[in-house]
């Protein structure tokens, strides 16, 4: 009943967003809506609804989309080169929408200050810090202190200078700190929190206690983000006791599922069916889950429709032309025909050299995988033929249908909404792994690295109901352990004192919310991800390039920021404004490469 009520509330919020608008540009159309609401007349509650929901959709879609591809958890075949081959360029990533949200947040803060509504001021400060920090995370230097002043005259208002990435982080941290006092007490101590406020808060239903934990948790996140550039031990230790305490504190928004804009982005209901079918499991994650006998695989992946076995006895002696045959629901592969036609069994240790690329495309080796009922596509397999991986034989690139590669689990992810579908922005599991990392450094965070590490794994299992609603699926899959204690007791999982072990499990736990996994990989190089031979530049990119709209509208200030970027050997002919250039956060760290 509680979950149903929350979905209803969020549906109402999305209706409110339609009325209020989600950007400065959209405000101009408000005069035509029958409610005749203008931004200045809009209630802070409805402004808050738009800021929260739109922030969740942007951040969440990125984490389950292109960044999930970058972190090799999911794979988009058939023209998915941005997703799975790292073909990033500045045309594909535009921050205009981020600044639209921040403009609304600025108005929310101003109105909340005018009404002296503490709760709303705190929310606006958290979201301002979060919004600008996201821009710094993905682009680097950007307009901040002089941004959002387009209605004012003056050169710096019309063409705002770019603040340094470092100062944007400092400002975000200051916002998170400034927000905390506004969340003092409980809901009963905040007369400004009305039923409308509760409905408009799509994350926590107007609960200041949870928002306060969130502010502290974001401080922890960004102190660790900066720890490779400056000493953050005292800061981390100062917030450790006040962060999320359970999965009930997770920062998330369930999908209303009423239309394409409020639904899980890859479901078929409001999209072309190929959108769901193109979004498959990446071999990097499926291999790791199988190696660890990890039961979370049953939550993530759909078993392949037709399992494969290599068996020469199913074919006539001397037959080296018949590649496959299906008998009683099993596909048999003819080893003689496979060898004669340049097919080879997938081997995770050698696959990057088993299949030559580029000038040798006419002699490429096609790979097949018979290892399990869960099969992912190897990262950067080759965007021209990845839809045919594992001897699919469909010949139809546009549909991406396959009986031999795992989609995301159909009854969960091919839906606009559902009990496990949400935009996930921060989690208790993430916080546990953050504290494990801090403890591994020798910092005092109220527990050992092993304790926090195990809690992080447990929180991930609980979040996805692995040993709850899906216990029977776990029990029915032969390739995984059946309970938490057995899982963490395995030598391949048990905490071994290394940062690598923490980051590997944190990466797995970031399923469908990979933004933090990407940030962690950038600053630590962990987990160590193999790059496929079909990748655009031979390495995972580090940032979003400044979009042409910004280069055209604010060229002088953009160029100053571009000149501060440090190019790498992977830039090719991009110039400094490359997704493989290093910004301040990575300069001098030798990470991730």
Tell what function each PLM region has.
Residues 1-32:
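Bacterial Sec-dependent N-terminal signal peptides
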Residues 42, 74-127, 133-463, 496-497:
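Structured, solvent-exposed acidic/aromatic patches
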Residues 60-69, 139-142, 234, 519:
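Beta-strand acidic-aromatic groove motif in beta-rich domains, primarily in extracellular
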Residues 24-78, 89, 111-114, 496, ...:
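Membrane-proximal, proline-rich intrinsically disordered regions
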Residues 437, 441-520:
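C-terminal structural cap/anchor segments
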Residues 186-190, 230-231, 467, 509-519, ...:
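Substrate-binding/catalytic groove segments of enzymes
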Residues 64-67, 302-303, 514-523:
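Short coil/turn segments at secondary-structure boundaries
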């Amino acid at each position: 009943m509680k979950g149903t009520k929350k979905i209803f509330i969020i549906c109402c919020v999305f209706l409110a967003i339609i009325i209020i608008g989600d950007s400065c540009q959209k405000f101009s159309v408000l005069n035509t809506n029958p409610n005749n609401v203008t931004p200045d007349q809009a209630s802070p509650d409805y402004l808050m609804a738009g800021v929260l929901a739109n922030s969740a959709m942007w951040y969440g879609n990125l984490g389950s989309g292109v960044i999930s591809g970058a972190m090799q958890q999911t794979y988009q075949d058939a023209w998915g080169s941005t997703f799975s081959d790292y073909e990033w360029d500045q045309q594909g990533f535009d921050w205009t929408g981020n600044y639209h949200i921040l403009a609304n947040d600025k108005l929310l803060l101003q109105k909340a200050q005018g009404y002296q509504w503490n709760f709303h001021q705190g929310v606006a400060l958290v979201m301002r810090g979060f919004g600008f920090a996201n821009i710094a995370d993905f682009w680097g230097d950007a307009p901040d202190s002089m941004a959002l002043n387009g209605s004012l005259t003056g050169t710096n208002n019309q063409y705002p200078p770019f603040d340094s990435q470092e100062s944007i982080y400092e400002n975000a941290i200051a916002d998170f700190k400034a927000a905390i006092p506004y969340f003092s007490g409980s809901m009963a101590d905040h007369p400004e929190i009305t039923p409308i406020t509760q409905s408009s808060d799509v994350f926590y239903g107007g609960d200041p206690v949870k928002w306060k934990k969130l502010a502290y948790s974001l401080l922890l996140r960004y102190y660790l983000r900066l720890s490779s550039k400056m000493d953050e031990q005292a800061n981390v230790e100062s917030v450790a006791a006040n962060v999320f305490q359970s999965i009930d504190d997770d920062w998330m928004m369930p999908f209303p599922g009423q239309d394409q804009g409020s639904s899980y982005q890859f479901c078929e209901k409001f999209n072309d069916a190929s959108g769901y079918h193109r979004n498959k499991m990446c071999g990097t994650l499926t291999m790791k889950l199988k190696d660890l006998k990890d039961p979370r695989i049953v939550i993530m992946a759909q078993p392949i429709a037709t399992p494969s076995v290599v068996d020469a006895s199913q074919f006539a002696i001397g037959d080296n032309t018949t590649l496959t045959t299906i008998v009683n629901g099993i596909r048999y592969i003819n080893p003689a025909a496979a060898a004669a036609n340049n097919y080879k069994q997938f081997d995770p240790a050698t696959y990057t050299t088993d299949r030559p690329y580029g000038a040798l495309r006419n002699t490429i080796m096609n790979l097949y995988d018979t290892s399990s009922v869960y099969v992912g596509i190897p990262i950067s397999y080759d965007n021209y033929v990845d839809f045919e991986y594992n001897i699919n034989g469909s010949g139809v690139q546009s549909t991406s249908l396959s009986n031999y590669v795992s989609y995301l689990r159909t009854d969960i992810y091919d839906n606009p909404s559902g009990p496990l579908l949400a935009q996930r922005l921060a989690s208790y599991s993430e916080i546990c792994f953050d504290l494990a990392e801090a403890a591994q450094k020798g910092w005092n965070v109220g527990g050992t690295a092993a304790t926090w590490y195990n809690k992080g794994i447990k929180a991930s299992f609980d979040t996805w109901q692995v040993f709850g609603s899906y216990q029977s699926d776990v029990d029915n899959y032969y390739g995984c352990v059946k309970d938490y204690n057995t899982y963490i007791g395995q030598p391949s999982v048990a905490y071994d004192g290394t940062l690598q072990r923490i980051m590997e499990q944190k990466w797995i736990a970031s399923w469908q919310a990979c933004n933090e996994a990407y940030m962690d990989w950038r600053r630590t190089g962990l987990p160590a991800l193999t790059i496929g031979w079909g990748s655009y530049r031979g390495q995972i990119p580090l940032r979003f390039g400044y979009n042409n709209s910004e280069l055209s509208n604010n060229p002088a200030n953009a160029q100053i920021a571009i000149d501060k970027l440090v190019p790498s050997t992977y830039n090719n002919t991009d110039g400094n404004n490359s997704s493989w250039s290093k910004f301040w956060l990575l300069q001098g760290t030798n990470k991730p490469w």
